[in-house]
């Protein structure tokens, strides 16, 4: 039996609540399949599109005097509840259909970051919708948002993405896992908080990369494997070129060389690779599997996906 952290990509969860719910129902079958094989899993998820949409909608309402503006940390908490609810419900239903008596809990999770992190001076995390270059330029002029081109898919708003330092609710996660609870935690990388005087915490406007927090969580609870589910089947080098090549198996030294060659897009595949390296360096006997959400079953059989080891 292995202990596994499964990190679901926010971009792989669809563009609407309805699409997300259908994708989550299918994902629940694969995740419960891991449980029936005797594995112990903890689930995390991204929230880039979802938190961006929540923030955009609330800002629109505030600009038209239809409600208050909400800080980004609160928007992150809303996205944890929204995505976590759909995951939790789908998992509960699938477990029940399989005759498995197991509780599922979504835990609103805070993650400590450093207020002095240089990421606050260099926004890099894409969130929200994809725009054309013309649309992005117009919104940038109107709202002052920063945009980047995101791996050939269009332009997206970027926000600071500081490094996770510690998971505030870690002991609660451990207790739930030890008591046979299926835990959904660290949604969207966790709500970023900074430590103030007397060890109090305060939310800060940012989005932590969910794969980096998932790697930290995996190390903290001594997992055997980190599974990163995204929108593509493999990790690729020379991505979107005539020389595009899928990596089926690789190791962290090779990946470090590819990072030096700038093979992975910043804010897209790069943080996944950095997270994989971090996880394995903290778990030398562990492995990382990166593949698409809809290919999880085939990837677990070794038929598809990128497997990373030391």
Curated annotation (Swiss-Prot):
SUPFAM superfamilies: Carbamate kinase-like. The keyword Transferase applies. Pathway: Metabolic intermediate metabolism; carbamoyl phosphate degradation; CO(2) and NH(3) from carbamoyl phosphate: step 1/1. The keyword Repeat does not apply. Its main location: cytoplasm. It catalyses: hydrogencarbonate + NH4(+) + ATP = carbamoyl phosphate + ADP + H2O + H(+). GO terms for biological process: arginine deiminase pathway. Gene3D superfamilies: Acetylglutamate kinase-like. GO terms for molecular function: ATP binding; carbamate kinase activity. InterPro entries: AceGlu_kinase-like_sf, Asp/Glu/Uridylate_kinase, Carb_kinase. Pfam families: AA_kinase. Its EC number is 2.7.2.2. One of its GO terms (cellular component) is cytosol. It is an enzyme of class 2 (transferase). Keywords: Arginine metabolism, ATP-binding, Cytoplasm, Kinase, Nucleotide-binding, Transferase. It is found in: Cytoplasm. Belongs to the carbamate kinase family. PANTHER family: CARBAMATE KINASE (PTHR30409), CARBAMATE KINASE-RELATED (PTHR30409:SF1). This is Carbamate kinase 1. The lineage of its organism: Bacteria, Bacillati, Bacillota, Bacilli, Bacillales.
């Amino acid at each position: 039996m292995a202990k596994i952290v499964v990190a679901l990509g926010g971009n792989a969860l669809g563009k609407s609540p309805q699409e997300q719910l259908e994708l989550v129902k299918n994902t629940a079958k694969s995740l419960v399949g891991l449980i029936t094989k005797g594995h112990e899993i903890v689930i995390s998820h991204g929230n880039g599109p979802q938190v961006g949409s929540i923030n955009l909608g609330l800002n629109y309402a505030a600009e038209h005097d239809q409600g208050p503006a909400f800080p980004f940390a609160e928007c992150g908490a809303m996205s944890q509840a929204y995505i976590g609810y759909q995951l939790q419900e789908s998992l509960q239903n699938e477990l029940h259909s399989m005759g498995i008596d197991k509780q599922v809990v979504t835990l609103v999770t805070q993650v400590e970051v450093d207020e002095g992190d240089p990421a606050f001076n260099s926004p890099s995390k894409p969130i929200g919708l994809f725009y054309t270059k013309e649309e992005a330029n117009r919104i940038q002029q109107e709202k002052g948002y920063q945009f980047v081109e995101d791996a050939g898919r269009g332009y997206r708003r970027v926000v600071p993405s500081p490094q996770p330092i510690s998971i505030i609710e870690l002991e609660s996660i451990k207790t739930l896992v030890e008591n046979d609870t299926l835990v959904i935690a660290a949604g969207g990388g966790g709500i970023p908080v900074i430590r103030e005087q007397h060890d109090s915490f305060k939310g800060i406007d940012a989005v932590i990369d969910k794969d980096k927090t998932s790697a930290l969580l995996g190390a903290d609870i001594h997992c055997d494997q980190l599974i990163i589910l995204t929108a593509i089947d493999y990790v690729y080098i020379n991505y979107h070129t005539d020389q595009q090549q899928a990596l089926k198996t690789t190791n962290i030294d090779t990946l470090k060389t590819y990072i030096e060659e700038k093979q992975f897009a910043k804010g897209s595949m790069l943080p996944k690779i950095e997270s994989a390296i971090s996880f394995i360096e903290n778990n030398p006997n562990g492995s990382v599997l990166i593949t698409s959400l809809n290919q999880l079953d085939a990837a677990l059989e070794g038929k598809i996906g990128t497997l990373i080891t030391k």
